[in-house]
Design a protein with these regions (language model features):
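Conserved ATP-binding subdomain of kinase catalytic cores across diverse folds
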Residues: 1-201, 206, 215-217
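Catalytic activation segment of kinase domains across protein kinase-like and atypical kinase folds
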Residues: 175, 200, 205-253
Length: 253
């Protein structure tokens, strides 16, 4: 669909129909003026039937996904309030914001659910059984960390039912921590790196780990346990790749 629109933009540009002195102004004219002209849009749809077919699929999938989010959340709201919101009512659902992270299974992606008490809950279109198992492991690891004087790990509250999951929305800490908190954070990050290495986790970069005061918090555990794929190449390339993957560096922490 995007490629079709790029072709169309180039066509109307060559025809001298775009208005504006800069690329930004011409792009704005195309989106805000030309795409609001019903006759022009009808002609574009007639010229690019495959694009229209893809649009129909995307719209159908989006509507189906929104229905699933609302239905699943409504059916499990009491458990969500208990496990994530301390038993307090979340109130009415005011909005659903999608488009965060990768898409799966017909365009489904992580969504933010906005409730009337200004509380946000994260909806994920898959089971969070791994997240719950990870939390149980980290509770035990937290005992060790606490015994060393570093404090316990901050874990994400979550609930799962069937092929859906909900987690609390965690804001990263914007205030600088004390020297002790910063020291504890880095020591905990070292412990966490060890755990992730043992689990053969990967993709644990800065977008998946939030700094919350003195504790690193993983907010995306999709790759905490993952299969190792065999990639072709020379023996030297494979050896180098294996050494990286089978090391702490392979976790990307």
């Amino acid at each position: 669909a995007y490629r079709s629109l790029i072709v169309e933009v180039n066509y109307v540009k060559t025809a001298g129909r775009l208005v504006g002195d800069t690329p930004e102004e011409r792009a704005e004219y195309f989106s805000d003026t030309m795409l609001r002209d019903r006759e022009y849009v009808a002609s574009v749809m007639a010229d690019y039937p495959e694009m229209v077919r893809l649009f129909h699929i995307r719209i159908k999938n989006a509507l189906s996904y929104f229905r699933k989010i609302i239905n699943d959340t409504s059916a499990n709201i009491r458990s969500i309030e208990t496990e994530i919101n301390g038993g307090e009512k979340l109130g009415r659902l005011l909005g659903v914001v999608t488009g965060s992270g990768d898409t799966h299974n017909g365009g489904q992606s992580v969504a933010r659910l906005i409730f009337e008490n200004e509380r946000m809950i994260i909806y994920k279109p898959h089971s969070l059984a791994i997240d719950l198992a990870y939390n149980r492991v980290m509770e035990k690891v937290g005992d060790y960390s606490e015994s060393l004087g570093y404090g316990r790990f901050r874990l994400t509250k979550c609930f799962t039912a069937g092929d859906s999951g909900w987690t609390e929305f965690i804001h990263s800490s914007s205030e600088p921590g004390s020297d002790e908190e910063i020291e504890n954070y880095h020591k905990k990050l070292g412990i966490l790196s060890c755990v992730l290495y043992v689990l053969s986790a990967g993709d644990m970069h800065s977008e998946n780990i939030i700094a919350l005061k003195e504790s690193p918090v993983i907010i995306d555990l999709e790759t905490v346990i993952q299969p190792r794929t065999v990639i072709g190449g020379s023996e030297v390339e494979q050896n180098v790749r294996d050494k990286i993957i089978n090391s702490v560096k392979g976790t990307l922490v």
